[in-house]
């Protein structure tokens, strides 16, 4: 069984986005692992494993427009099912 079962990925389109601030927020406030937050001031790609993807979406939506949202259940994938 995975500790964090949802692979959460999305793009944030915003202004003055700060990779370091986003990384700090995730580390301090969201439960999960495998964080990737990369991009520039206008566009950030997020990848994060969590059990609470809605918290990721809520935070990211507060930073700008979110799109290309993918939430996959890795436990189902591990069992050979659609995630």
Where are the language model's segments positioned?
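N-terminal loops that bind phosphate or other acidic moieties
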Residues: 1-83
